[in-house]
Structures are given as structure tokens and as C-alpha cells.
């Protein structure tokens, strides 16, 4: 194996039956709380009184509207995408219908356009009367879905998750099917602490009138409250960091225990097409109740849905798998293929528009060039038979990957019991092509020892020291994750090699493309390989015997790319709220607007008045 690269190379309160009218009355609570735990509700929560039979009650609308923030551009349309309207009366009827089913482990049962996991029927509790919804509270407005807490007359509590309309109907349906099946697999096969799912709907053709997941409510506090990544080194700091890292590493270790027969994503047997139903997902299942429960179908990893609304589903279906376990390179190539097709589709739409913006045309053309380069180099990136990569065969075997392993998605139900939530976008892929959880991942310059790695550190001004300390703490946290991985799965530790990280960087950068100019990071990661290509070929790390770099770059092209990348990075750093895509928390948005810092333009968007920022500097914290 090559030596390590240089270190410095980032509450319907109570629902009562009205004896005269036969109607239900209700209180709906909207809360600003941003986690699905049982912390005390905010004093700012709004109560909305309504009758369940009055579907046209205008007071209901605000219960479904997005309220957690606003955007500088296209605010109305983005909030419209995040409206989560559903039928409250339909929910009540549906839940009572579930209560009439027999509790048994079987394939999800179709019920009024939705699907029920009858084996989890006990989540409804016990009552001689009808099961009635007593209250509904909005408890979380996330990036991809909204969460409501449902309280029943049995005393039981459920969570209703409604996805935002950010993707196509087909994509939303696939993601819901796969997430429920993945959660079910983690619970039944691996015995992990995850919420039990009671029912799900993949479209609006059900009594709830919306796609949804209805699942177990888990009480507790988020593990994130314990995460303090920038604490100085000490025994206490080490202990506190491990209190967060360890349970997540242990959870991952259990996930990695199963090797699958294909690359793709998990679904229930009946949720994949017939041609895929004969292939078991993994070998050695001895429980007859589980042997035909799950299957592997198309991948729901985010690159197959993010910003793909204008791409025909038939094209997406060509590239989203599933793939045979013997062909891991297809997983790599699929990303380049889907992004290239998406860019070409966008260019076709621009060319068909006589009034199209030439800057948009130029940008898409550059994207196409980059993704053509990615398509060319992807099959050569990593040699899946390399003798220089320890346990390379294990690293390329199909294993389950959960992209949102994060303390924000871990609920401490008790001092010794953690529950994991949110498995959207989970996929089966080679472990070598996965990335570390975002809360510990660091792609910047590594500093392992402040005094040894930073010349003159002791003599630096405090502000300069803090910059290097930040880099050191991020490096330290990532290393702690790697030590845990090595402890549990030493056979997979080669993923920590700096060279492996560099080689798979173009693939990972492509997975992270969110806006038009992010292609620059993809290109940059390809360019980075050029200097080391001969050494990688000599050490059989890449899937090529040709020492000539696969992409021909001119000096002019590289200079232009470097300038455009630098300009984009400067634009990102200097533009307010660029890191959040122009999204601003609502309380901050209202304050900035009142101060005249945010000003509405003629087109309905908002701009930042720099001079007003200088007139209204952020308030300094009071001395205590």
C-alpha cells in the first residue's frame, strides 16, 4: 500500500363524540419544536379548533403549511412544495380499520389504498370501543418530511410522517416502500432499536389522502444534545465524545453483519416487479417467516431523485439498478450516467426555448463536459481485485448503507437504550464506496498534533490558533470514528486509507451535487487524481494498467477550472445563507426583515441590504 499522503492536503386535544350531531371536535396544535421527542411543548404553539367532519374549515390550512423558515428566492413555491395536507377524518377512520385486523406477521396488507403491517397492531393499544384520535400535534418540520404526533384514546402515541412534494410521485413512492422495508428488516432480522411501522401509503389514493408512514412514537431526548465536537482534549471530553460515537458505531457494526446478493435497495417481496421476486436478498435465512419477506430492487439513493423532476422515469429506470454483486463498477458508473443524462435533458429544454438564458446554456454545457469525464474515469477508479487493498473482496461486497446515521436521528429512550430513526435513501452498495457519517466526516486539511503539525502554533494570535484548533478537533473526531470502525471491523479498515478516499472522491462528490455549480467539485476531484495516477497504476489501486491519465486536460482548461472553482468558493463564503440554499429560520427571517436588512424585490424575492447589516450589527451576548 502506498504511504500516507501529506497530512495537510475538511394536540384534536381530546376528541369527543357530539351526541347531537355525531361529529368529532378537535384541537390541532402547531408547534415550533424541531424534534420528534417528548420535550415540553413550546409556549408559542398555536391551537386550532375544528370539527373532523368539516373538511373545508379554513383554520385547518395553517396546520399543514410550512412555517419553520423562508427562502430568499422562490419562497412561495418552495413552501407550497412543503405543504403536508392530509385528511384528519380519514386518518381516524383508517386507524380504527387497522384495529379490526388480525395481528400476524405477513406481507403488508392492502387496506383502503394503503398498506398495513398487521404484526405491529399492538401499537394501537387496547380498547373495547373504537380507536379514536384524541390529538394531533406538529412536532417537526424536517428537510424531507413533516412529523405529526398522534395521541389515541387508548393512551398510545404514534408518529405520522408526511413527505414533502420535492420529488416525482414515482420517486416518493419508491423511497417510502424502501424505507419501510429497511426499517422492518432492521427490526425483525437484526433486532435493532428502531420504530415499528404500523402502516404506509405510497400516494394520495388512500383514506389519509397523502403519501405517509404511520409508526411508533419513541419518547426521549436526541443524542445530539450530548454532541460537543469542539471541546478541548481531556479525559472528560474523550468520554463525552464516545457517548455519542460509540452507539452509532455499534449500530453500524450490526448493519454490516449481513452481506447481500445484489446492489440496490431493500423492499418488501410484493413491492418489487415479478422478475426480482425469485431472488433472495441474502443467503442462510432459517426463519421461514422472513425468508420471503424482503427483496432487493432499484436503488433509492438520492442521486436518482434529487433534481431529477424533469428527467423521464424510463431513463432513470435504466440506471438505478439493481445490480449483480459481481459488478460493483456498475454502482460507480450509474452516478455518472444519471447526472450526464440529467444535464443533457436540461440542455435540450434550454435549446427548445428561444428565450433561454445563455449563461444557463453555458453552465449546463460545462456540467455535461464534467460528467462525461466522470463517466470515462468511473470504471477505472478503484481496482476491485487489487492486492494492495487489504481485504478488497470484503470491501466490495454488497452491504446496507444508511446515509443519515447521525445523533440528530438517535433518540435516547433511557440511559442505556437508544432508538435510531430516519432510514430514507438507504441503499445496498460496496462498503468502500460509502462515506463516514456527516457528524464526524472531515474533508479539510488534517492536523493530528497542533504543536508538531503547525509551525509556530504557540506564538500565534488567539484567533489564528482557533482556526487551527477547529481543524484539529475535526480531525480528532474523524479519527475516533475510524478507531471504532477498526475495533469492530478491522477487515474493513482499509476504507480509512487516504488513497482510497482520494480515489472515490469523484464518485462521492457527484453524490453530493445539489446545485448547478457543484460540478466544479466533481471536476476538481478528478483533476486531483492526475498527479498520482502513475503511482496508483503501479500499485494496482486503479482498474487500469495504462499510466497515461484517462482524461486529457489542457493547461488553459485547468487554469479556467481553478479560477471558476475559486470564484464559486468565494461566492459561497461571501453570500449570506448560501450554505442553506437561501433558507433562513423564520424567527431570524422576521427579525432581519423588520430591521430592513432583508428587502423584498419586485419579483417577490428578497435581497440582503449590506449597509443595513452595518447599521444593525448582531447583538453582543450579555455578560453573566
UniProtKB/Swiss-Prot annotation:
It comes from the Eukaryota. Residues 1-34 form a transit peptide. InterPro entries: Aminoglycoside_PTrfase, Kinase-like_dom_sf, Mito_inheritance_9. Keywords: Mitochondrion, Transit peptide. Pfam families: APH. Its main location: mitochondrion. The keyword DNA-binding does not apply. One of its GO terms (cellular component) is mitochondrion. It is found in: Mitochondrion. SUPFAM superfamilies: Protein kinase-like (PK-like) (SSF56112). The keyword Mitochondrion applies. PANTHER family: ALTERED INHERITANCE OF MITOCHONDRIA PROTEIN 9, MITOCHONDRIAL. Belongs to the AIM9 family. This is Altered inheritance of mitochondria protein 9, mitochondrial. The lineage of its organism: Eukaryota, Fungi, Dikarya, Ascomycota, Saccharomycotina.
Amino acid at each position: 500500500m502506498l504511504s500516507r499522503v501529506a497530512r495537510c492536503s475538511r394536540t384534536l386535544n381530546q376528541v369527543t363524540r357530539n351526541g347531537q350531531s355525531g361529529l368529532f371536535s378537535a384541537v390541532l396544535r402547531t408547534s415550533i419544536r424541531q424534534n420528534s421527542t417528548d420535550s415540553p411543548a413550546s409556549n408559542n404553539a398555536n391551537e386550532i379548533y375544528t370539527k373532523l367532519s368539516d373538511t373545508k374549515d379554513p383554520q385547518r390550512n395553517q396546520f399543514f403549511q410550512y412555517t419553520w423558515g423562508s427562502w430568499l428566492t422562490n419562497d412561495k413555491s418552495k413552501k407550497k412544495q412543503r405543504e403536508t395536507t392530509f385528511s384528519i377524518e380519514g386518518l381516524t377512520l383508517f386507524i380504527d380499520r387497522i384495529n379490526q385486523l388480525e395481528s400476524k406477521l405477513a406481507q403488508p396488507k392492502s387496506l383502503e389504498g394503503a398498506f398495513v403491517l398487521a404484526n405491529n397492531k399492538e401499537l394501537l393499544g387496547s380498547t373495547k370501543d373504537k380507536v379514536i384520535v384524541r390529538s394531533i400535534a406538529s412536532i417537526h418540520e424536517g428537510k424531507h418530511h413533516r412529523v405529526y404526533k398522534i395521541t389515541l384514546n387508548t393512551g398510545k402515541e404514534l408518529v405520522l410522517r408526511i413527505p414533502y412534494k420535492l420529488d416525482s410521485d414515482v420517486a416518493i413512492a419508491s423511497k417510502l416502500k424502501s424505507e419501510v422495508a429497511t426499517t422492518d428488516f432492521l427490526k425483525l432480522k437484526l433486532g435493532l432499536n428502531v420504530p415499528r411501522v404500523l402502516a404506509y401509503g405510497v400516494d394520495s389514493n388512500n383514506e389519509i389522502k397523502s403519501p405517509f408512514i404511520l409508526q411508533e412514537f419513541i419518547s426521549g431526548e436526541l443524542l445530539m444534545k450530548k454532541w460537543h465536537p469542539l471541546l478541548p482534549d481531556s479525559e472528560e471530553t474523550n468520554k463525552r465524545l464516545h457517548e455519542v460515537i460509540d452507539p452509532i458505531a455499534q449500530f453500524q457494526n450490526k448493519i454490516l453483519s449481513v452481506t447481500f446478493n445484489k446492489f440496490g435497495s431493500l423492499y418488501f417481496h410484493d413491492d418489487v416487479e415479478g422478475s426480482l421476486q425469485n431472488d433472495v436478498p441474502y443467503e442462510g435465512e432459517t426463519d421461514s417467516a422472513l425468508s420471503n419477506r424482503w427483496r432487493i430492487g432499484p436503488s433509492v439513493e438520492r442521486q436518482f431523485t434529487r433534481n431529477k423532476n424533469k428527467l423521464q422515469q424510463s431513463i432513470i429506470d435504466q440506471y438505478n439498478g439493481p445490480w449483480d454483486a459481481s459488478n460493483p463498477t456498475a454502482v460507480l458508473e450509474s452516478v455518472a450516467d444519471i447526472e450526464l443524462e440529467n444535464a443533457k435533458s436540461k440542455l435540450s429544454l434550454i435549446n427548445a426555448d428561444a428565450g433561454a438564458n445563455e449563461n444557463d446554456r453555458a453552465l449546463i454545457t460545462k456540467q455535461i463536459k464534467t460528467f462525461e469525464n466522470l463517466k470515462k474515469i468511473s470504471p477505472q477508479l478503484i481496482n476491485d481485485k487489487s492486492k494492495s487493498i487489504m481485504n478488497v473482496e470484503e470491501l466490495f461486497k454488497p452491504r446496507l448503507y444508511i446515509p443519515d446515521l447521525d445523533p440528530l436521528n438517535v433518540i435516547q429512550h433511557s440511559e442505556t437504550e437508544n432508538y435510531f430513526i430516519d432510514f430514507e435513501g438507504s441503499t445496498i452498495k460496496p462498503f468502500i464506496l460509502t462515506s463516514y457519517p456527516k457528524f464526524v466526516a472531515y474533508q479539510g486539511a488534517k492536523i493530528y498534533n497542533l504543536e508538531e503539525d503547525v509551525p509556530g502554533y504557540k506564538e500565534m494570535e488567539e484567533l489564528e490558533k482557533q482556526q487551527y484548533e477547529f481543524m484539529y478537533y475535526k480531525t480528532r473526531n474523524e479519527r475516533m470514528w475510524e478507531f471504532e470502525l477498526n475495533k469492530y471491523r478491522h477487515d474493513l479498515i482499509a476504507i480509512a486509507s487516504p488513497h482510497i478516499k482520494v480515489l472515490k472522491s469523484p464518485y462521492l462528490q457527484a453524490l453530493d451535487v445539489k446545485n448547478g455549480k457543484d460540478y466544479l467539485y466533481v471536476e476538481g476531484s478528478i483533476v486531483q487524481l492526475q498527479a498520482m495516477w502513475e503511482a496508483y497504476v503501479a500499485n494496482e489501486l486503479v482498474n487500469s494498467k495504462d499510466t497515461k491519465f484517462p482524461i486529457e486536460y489542457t493547461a488553459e482548461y485547468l487554469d479556467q477550472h481553478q479560477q471558476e472553482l475559486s470564484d464559486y468558493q468565494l461566492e459561497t463564503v461571501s453570500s449570506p445563507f448560501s450554505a442553506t440554499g437561501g433558507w433562513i429560520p423564520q424567527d431570524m427571517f422576521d427579525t432581519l426583515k423588520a430591521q430592513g436588512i432583508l428587502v423584498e424585490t419586485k419579483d417577490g424575492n428578497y435581497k440582503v441590504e449590506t449597509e443595513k447589516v452595518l447599521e444593525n450589527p448582531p447583538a453582543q451576548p450579555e455578560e453573566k
